UniProtKB/Swiss-Prot annotation:
Residues 93-128 are annotated as: Disordered. Belongs to the SAA family. InterPro entries: Serum_amyloid_A, Synovial_Prolif_Regulator. This is Serum amyloid A-4 protein. Residues 1-18 form the signal peptide. Gene3D superfamilies: Serum amyloid A protein. SMART domains: SAA. Keywords: Secreted, Signal. One of its GO terms (cellular component) is extracellular region. It holds the Pfam family SAA. It comes from the Eukaryota. It comes from Sus scrofa (Pig). Apolipoprotein of the HDL complex.
């Protein structure tokens, strides 16, 4: 636990720009909110093969907030990936490795500022 907290703190220090701590944390909270909204929309849409689009969209919107949003998107994506790996280790997950790689690619695509519609499945309602 101490190691985890230390890693979080170090990544915070490395991620803070000259804009200051307040704006960084504000961006991080807003970025986390963007990821949550994308996750909620994915669950609400319940549309086949739309997961990569929503992952890219959430990371894209978070990255638009600034360095804090990018940091939050990376942390949340990594925690989700580690949790998924733990579930696979315990035998509780059926997600394949190629799906994980594809999801990671979609998240990085969004964080880099590229258009998340690249992953948008045909027929997904315009609401999303």
């Amino acid at each position: 636990m101490k190691l985890f907290i230390g890693l979080i703190f170090c990544s915070l220090v490395m991620g803070v720009s000259s804009d200051g701590w307040f704006s960084f944390f504000k961006e991080a909270v807003q970025g986390a909110s963007d990821l949550w909204r994308a996750y909620w929309d994915m669950k609400e849409a319940n549309y086949q093969n739309s997961g990569r689009y929503f992952r890219a969209r959430g990371n894209y919107e978070a990255a638009q907030r600034g360095p804090g949003g990018i940091w939050a998107a990376k942390i949340i994506s990594n925690v989700g990936e580690y949790f998924q790996g733990l579930l696979q280790y315990l035998g509780s997950s059926s997600e394949r490795e190629e799906d994980q790689v594809s999801n990671r690619r979609a998240e990085e695509w969004g964080r880099s500022g590229q258009d998340p519609d690249h992953f948008r499945p045909a027929g997904l309602p315009k609401k999303y």
